[in-house]
Curated annotation (Swiss-Prot):
Keywords: Cell membrane, Cell projection, Disulfide bond, EGF-like domain, Glycoprotein, GPI-anchor, Immunity, Innate immunity, Lipoprotein, Membrane, Repeat, Secreted, Signal
Residues excised as propeptide: 622-643
Listed name of the protein: Uromodulin
Chain spans, region ZP-C: 456-587
């Protein structure tokens, strides 16, 4: 029997068993002292026991704490579907996606990148179009590109403009404003021969100096203008109303006035000068010449119906032939129906073409005479206030419009023998609140002047109207109504910059006396919002335009008061820097704000008519809201009469 263990040979079998102990995850751990707790854990000492627990937003046993990624754990965060969860150390945040901004009231609200400069990356010439969470850029007509980069293409620009390179981009420009200068004495046709070659020219140029300011229009002898084959304009120069025209420049050599030619463009500019889009000549030595008889023009800037002409070396603006008329019926009339004035203008050039060297013009009241205006053209104008009476103006009115009529008398001498020319003209205005007050004899109205620093003085008016059309104000200093009637109150703003300011009714209330500070007040509008408890109150317009409107059913104060006075505190709201349109919740609480009596309009008295039903609340008029000061009818007629 063999021995299992031998001193010479021995097998050893060893069995090793490994144990891995994984501690169970717990929220707390016992510790000897608080110093053993993790920096993101909380230490609790209860008698002899000390425990460590991870703070909210962390996970672990208190001795070791790691950040909990709430965004990765379902239900660990409360971000809505429209927001993105972003994990932070010990917490998380809900952020809006790109193109949205977090609002405490509306959640993720779209950012209008087009509203403010710098928010979009659109090209300066492009139009920015806002979308939900994004925006797009569109190049203007005639331009190519993705909107972030826009370039014109040859022939794509409007009349009188050309596509030229400025820096790294192609843009549409007026060559009268953007060009280079050529001031070289040797370009004169009177200068002798030379070896200049305009091979480097290209683009828009203007000739200046004593050598002449424009290309000659006739063939130039060879060996002039400091070159061998002088170049001249084969054609005539355009007038300023033709814009950019195509022409050919010819080079004279070997007995041929147009042996070589080059395409060019020409434009006549206001002020009596020309600009040329020159191209390099096809050969050398060729150079562009100038006409020395065309000295530098000294016209003041001519109008669109004038050309700068030289007469015996003197430059002045002359009427263009294109604007001449031969018949009085073709005389152009410009009628402007303004807010406060009516102006009729006649073209001075056309009057001159009809033989009016001197113009005498006046209205029904001859004290209202004509005067000269220099704008885009020279005009002879007369002005009358848009009121009944001044300058002989007559006002007529129907249910929808107020019309102001007058007659212009025209003569070319102080005395009239042969012909008396009359031009009848009229402006019609839709009846809105302002026009209605202006055309009423004694409207029930209150007025207040408000001065805004740097922007002028404004006048605010408040009036009482008979219907929801707000076109028939009550007449006189008082009115009597039953409690079944409705009060239609309109406020309106005049003067100053109406494009910037709107009228805001902050507090409107009634009192039984004319005292606006009477402690007995019934608020119709308070803190910009209508009284919610009174269902008869309707605010049609407030903080949206230069006018405000509201209505309320007539009432009387308890205590046998028969008089009602209306008071409105108004505020001029700057739409550039303020939010003007009120936002009114369904439930409102009285704020007790102090009323500024310097901004209060007062109206009344309105007397209660006992027992008798006055007008009930009318249905909305078919007129709707008429836009302020929009002239719907502009008319002018021409009548020739013998004396």
């Amino acid at each position: 029997m063999k021995c299992l263990f031998s001193p010479n040979f021995m097998w050893m079998a060893a069995v090793v068993t490994s144990w891995v102990i994984i501690p169970a995850a717990t929220d707390t751990s016992s510790a000897k002292s608080c110093s053993e707790c993790h920096s993101n854990a909380t230490c609790t000492v209860d008698g002899a026991a000390t425990t460590c627990a991870c703070q909210e937003g962390f996970t672990g046993d208190g001795l070791e704490c790691v950040d909990l990624d709430e965004c990765a754990v379902l239900g660990a965060h409360n971000c809505s579907a429209t927001k993105s969860c972003v994990n932070t150390l010990g917490s998380y945040t809900c952020v809006c996606p790109e193109g949205f901004l977090l609002s405490s009231e509306l959640g993720c609200e779209d950012v209008d990148e087009c509203a403010e400069p710098g928010l979009s990356r659109c090209h300066a010439l492009a139009t920015c179009i806002n979308g939900e969470g994004n925006y797009s850029c569109v190049c203007p007509a005639g331009y190519l590109g993705d909107g972030r980069h826009c370039e014109c293409s040859p022939g794509s620009c409007g009349p009188g403009l050309d596509c030229v390179r400025e820096g790294d981009a192609l843009v549409c420009v007026d060559p009268c404003q953007v060009h280079r200068i050529l001031d070289e004495y040797w370009r004169s046709t009177e200068y002798g021969s030379g070896y200049i070659c305009d091979v480097s020219l290209g683009g828009w140029y203007r000739f200046v100096g004593q050598a002449g300011v424009r290309l000659p229009e006739t063939c130039v002898p060879v060996l002039h203008c400091n070159t061998a084959a002088p170049m001249w304009l084969n054609g005539t120069h355009p007038s300023s109303d033709e814009g950019i025209v195509n022409r050919v420049a010819c080079a004279h050599w070997s007995g041929d006035c147009c042996l070589w030619d080059a395409p060019i463009q020409v434009k006549a500019c206001a002020g009596g000068y020309y600009v040329y889009n020159l191209t390099a000549p096809p050969e050398c030595h060729l150079a562009y010449c100038t006409d020395p008889s065309s000295v530098e023009g000294t016209c003041e800037e001519c109008r669109v119906d004038e050309d700068c002409k030289s007469d015996n070396g003197e430059w002045h603006c002359q009427c263009k032939q294109d604007f001449n008329v031969t018949d009085l019926s073709l005389l152009e009339r410009r009628l402007e129906c303004g807010v406060d004035d009516i102006k009729l203008s006649l073209s001075k050039c056309q009057l001159k073409s009809l033989g009016f060297e001197k113009v005498f013009m006046y209205l029904h009241d001859s004290q209202c005479s004509g005067f000269t205006e220099r704008g885009d053209r020279d005009w002879m104008s007369v002005v009358t206030p848009a009121r009944d009476g001044p300058c002989g103006t007559v006002m007529t009115r129907n249910e929808t419009h107020a019309t102001y009529s007058n007659t212009l008398y025209l003569a070319d001498e102080i005395i009239i023998r042969d012909l008396n020319i009359r031009i009848n003209f009229a402006c019609s205005y839709p009846l809105d609140m302002k026009v209605s007050l202006k055309t009423s004899l004694q409207p029930m109205v209150s007025a207040l002047n408000i001065s805004m620093g740097g922007t002028g003085t404004f006048t605010v008016r408040m009036a009482l109207f008979q219907s929801p059309a707000y076109t028939q104000p009550y007449q006189g200093s008082s009115v009597t109504l039953s409690t079944e009637a409705f009060l239609y109150v309109g406020t309106m703003l005049d003067g100053g910059d109406l494009s910037r300011f709107v009228l805001l009714m902050t507090n409107c209330y009634a009192t039984p006396s004319s005292n606006a500070t009477d402690p007995l007040k019934y608020f119709i509008i308070q803190d910009r919002c209508p009284r919610a408890a009174d269902s008869t109150i309707q605010v049609e317009e407030n903080g949206e335009s230069p006018q405000g409107r509201f209505s309320v059913q007539m009432f009387r104060f308890a205590g046998n008061y028969d008089l009602v006075y209306l008071h409105c505190e108004v505020y001029l709201c700057d739409t550039v820097n303020e939010k003007c349109r009120p936002t009114c919740p369904e439930t409102r609480f009285r704020s007790g704000s102090i009323i500024d009596q310097t901004r209060v309009l007062n109206l009344g008295p309105i007397t209660r008519k006992g027992g008798q039903a006055a007008m009930s609340r009318a249905a909305p008029s078919s007129l709707g809201l008429l836009q302020v000061w929009l002239p719907l009818l502009l008319s002018a007629t021409l009548t020739l009469m013998s004396p």
